């Protein structure tokens, strides 16, 4: 047995538990027939003051597979609007809050499980996710982290040796348990549940807790409540813009899946765009397309409006309306800035009308171009040359005879003319900065569905984890290299 488990000696704080029994239920973790550590996110350990070299695989398994040494384990209570219909029959159905630890940066972080067994909110389910679902979450969260999108992360993924039967993937399939590393698991739906039971006192208690814990810069401000909601609106608008620029479709933007700190979490049937299709819907069960790609900003704003109902028990309507009023402008400004970065430019380099025109022209091109959304930006990164500034014909020359030959020439030429015009308006000294920006904003490969399957199939067929490790390594060493967990294919 390795030395004292560092996860069990962390200075856990009972921040959420201190709210009392109205907010959660104590539960017991499931036991599993086997434990194989498949992924450990060593990048997160220094945030906790831990040296990855001193943390053994068995430490992960003991803490996050056998769940030894922690009590209480809390299933959090919440409600939510699911596909527009209010559901009071929700809560942590296959996970719990393992503990909360303050990082070296002073922030409080949650260890939240997924797949740790039944709770009072399992609604007849077995409380266990598939291994493929765990691998998909690793891919989504690490890629979004690579892009600079606010996201929870996977701290560990452990295969648990059971066979599961699921209707949405070939069965029997393999089981897993995951520990997520998030700023918080408090959701819009956490507040909605309190309104459902007409508990204004608990809304006040929870709001005070959220401000003190996650918006502490507002403590002591007489307008803290109003400023909290306005800042949450900004964070949520920023998050929606980050998703849209990344070509990411969350798939299930119910109010119980939106974080009170504006962080991506609760990954389900997510997908990244292959071809640019604004009406793309990621979830096979979203028959109406409610949560399709193009709807995400509007849904985020709608969910903020729904959050006004419980917050309105302790806040004025005027403060709430003022807080959400800036959503559209904030979203558009962030989206434009991020899209310009994907094209190699900073917003302050260009007049806003010129910048917007380039973005619109790019999206119009991608609507008809036989090329993937993220592939377009990756190719722009790979082929950009400073010579484009002086030679219009040098801009992506191979496209004319290959991918773009099916496009009307005027459409392709229109995009190329605009891009060239912007280059000529910039000093030549800024061209290397464009190359740097393109590299930072555009990974060489994105986890579109064929890529996900190319990673999963070797695992499913041959227990071969090398393709997953190779893909994570590409993101790890590409651009800023933000994604850097470690695949552990043969841990016992």
UniProtKB/Swiss-Prot annotation:
Its cofactor is Mg(2+); Mn(2+). ATP binds at residues 91, 93-94, 114, 126-127, 180, 187, 266. Nucleotidyltransferase involved in the post-translational modification of proteins. It can catalyze the addition of adenosine monophosphate (AMP) or uridine monophosphate (UMP) to a protein, resulting in modifications known as AMPylation and UMPylation. The active site is at residue 256. It comes from Synechococcus sp. (strain ATCC 27144 / PCC 6301 / SAUG 1402/1) (Anacystis nidulans). InterPro entries: SelO. Mg(2+) binds at residues 257, 266. Keywords: ATP-binding, Magnesium, Manganese, Metal-binding, Nucleotide-binding, Nucleotidyltransferase, Transferase. Belongs to the SELO family. It catalyses: L-seryl-[protein] + ATP = 3-O-(5'-adenylyl)-L-seryl-[protein] + diphosphate; L-threonyl-[protein] + ATP = 3-O-(5'-adenylyl)-L-threonyl-[protein] + diphosphate; L-tyrosyl-[protein] + ATP = O-(5'-adenylyl)-L-tyrosyl-[protein] + diphosphate; L-histidyl-[protein] + UTP = N(tele)-(5'-uridylyl)-L-histidyl-[protein] + diphosphate. The keyword Nucleotide-binding applies. It comes from the Bacteria. Pfam families: SelO (PF02696). HAMAP family: YdiU_SelO. NCBIfam families: PRK00029.1. This is Protein nucleotidyltransferase YdiU.
